[in-house]
Amino acid sequence: MSEVAQNSPAEVQAKKVVYCGVCTLPPEYCEFGGTAKKCEEWLKDNHAELYQRLYSEEALSSNLSELSVSVRERAAKDAAKKEAKAAAAEARDAERKAAAKVQIKRVERNKRKHVTVITGLEVHGLENKKVAKELGKKFATGSSVTKSPAGVEEITVQGDVSEDVKEWLLELYGKEIPESNIELVEDKKKKTSG
């Protein structure tokens, strides 16, 4: 039998791809997102050589010279439209966050038993399950995430810890939630006369 020389194939190396820190796309595709200007600034600060390759005067003029005048105008309009949409969405989110209230409600269960119900954390970018777990550890009580009759997720903590929860939220999440957006509410069950 003849020996066949086996050539081992060259090892395949994974290509290192840079992803934008703003829109999480490769920088070549940032122009198709709504945050092109921010992406361009990020690229300039973090990857200067790639910025020069994509956004230098020569690169831009060579790309534009290949396009017809009508296509250039349309591209400029589309870019402006996308940028305006992204800015409007950002402003809307900021406005919603500023207006959103975190409500800490003390609810009477039985005669001297209370629970604390917290709603509105998810608007500020906090995960209810994680916060509920942290609250349970912090105050050594039972805490859970439940859906209210209105369909909104809320955190229920056993015991009257509303003041402590407010202080704890401000201490841990003061950057996300301003103090003016946290309100304490006391809710008593109505006595039924029988």
From Swiss-Prot:
The keyword Cell wall biogenesis/degradation does not apply. The SUI1 domain may be involved in RNA binding. GO terms for biological process: formation of translation preinitiation complex; nuclear-transcribed mRNA catabolic process, nonsense-mediated decay; ribosome disassembly; translation reinitiation. This is Translation machinery-associated protein 22. InterPro entries: DENR/SUI1_TIF, DENR_C, DENR_eukaryotes, DENR_N, SUI1, SUI1_dom_sf. Residues 102-173 form the SUI1 domain. GO terms for molecular function: translation initiation factor activity. It is found in: Cytoplasm. Coiled coil: none annotated.
